[in-house]
């Protein structure tokens, strides 16, 4: 009996299985590792098969493993293809968005065309294209963008810029400076399209300043009325926006463009009076010559459509067109009242009925007083159904302007004026004190309480309170603790109707509390805005010395803020008596 087996080794068979023969006698420790008999028979049959058949059968792949690889590779390929399609679609959508998206609200902050807004804090986007001068329709078609930048360089031939966050409220304590630089030999045309900045005398707190480099300041604006188009003869402008830490507004938006010298223009609703200057339409034929060539006041009789004119008698009457019927739309009437030198003028309105609006922006009457220098100073603007207080002026010239828009019409007014001889006595206004009219600060009834022969009798009877003028406690927090505790409203000197309006205004002055001169400035400001009410029912302005002390102490501090002293102290009375003015 054989104790060994015959073994035939084939190289190709070794590829099919690592173990072609198994004998437990030679590997006792392996345990039952031999394949089952069926498998042994299968191996034996494969060894007995022809060589080429065994070769072909040995090269067949594992079907289960191959299908798994195919599925895996197919999935990866589909995933990559999907990612590629997504990237392509995203790029196509990004490039087609400006053409398919409608313009957002045109009140958003504007960004120049063709430039992606920068995220750098101190940069502002500008145009880099050399497009021709824009028309109004082209400007409106531009797609505005919410702009958060504050200042920067604007080197392109045209562009837009706006206050931070426009049209939302601009942040407090902002100081943004834009430098507009166009090519040498070109000049800059600037247009402020929208404006809503805290309004205050001389734009003391929040303001937009335009400065020509290197000549100096051109314009300072605040409030809610955009100025006319600004044409310059420089290629470099510096635009500065400043806000304090109190009252905010929506700010501004503006555009600029490079213009060849001599090719300046104005907007369609503006008056182009000479090479550079543009005027708002309501500044034309208003009695104040602003154009160097006087063209804004030329041929005004033809423009007023039969209203307005020159009144030179000692007494006169004038009225709105069609009075007492409704006045026409789009009227601009100017009456020039002139009496002999040495006379003043008393103006009174009767049956007053104009379109009512809080700021008298639509239909209104304005009164101007001539100065000794030949210019006109603004006295007041009136509208609504209540006649204005009588206007008494020490000057011998007044200008009365009546303007209407396209909207509501009403009955208008009838007005009379009378000349007053200022040289007949030492108390020229005594007989007119009872009217309590709106007048120059130096010609108030209080100044003339001591009349001829040092007697108070002539004027004291006329110092009774006005029908709607009664003393009331001072309620403005900033003005508590003055030398007096009663006031009266309306305040005809500054055009404020209630103490609430004063409180709103004084919020802007809180930023000055840190100045060394604040207490002196506070006394003067409260004396002007919340005047003293006397036991006789009259109101007293602050004395000139109070204003001068505040000016002397605060002028240098305000200069550091870039603001000149905003008040003319010479308009206030000298303390001729205890009842001439107040010492808050």
Swiss-Prot record:
Topology of this chain in the membrane: Single-pass type II membrane protein
Domain FZ intervals: 466-584
Biased composition (Low complexity): 119-132
Extracellular compartment spans: 91-584
Pfam families listed in its UniProt record: CUB, Fz, Ldl_recept_a
GO cellular component terms given for this protein: apical plasma membrane
SUPFAM superfamilies: Frizzled cysteine-rich domain, LDL receptor-like module, Spermadhesin, CUB domain
Known function: May play a role in eye development.
Protein name per its UniProtKB record: Membrane frizzled-related protein
Organism whose genome encodes this protein: Mus musculus (Mouse)
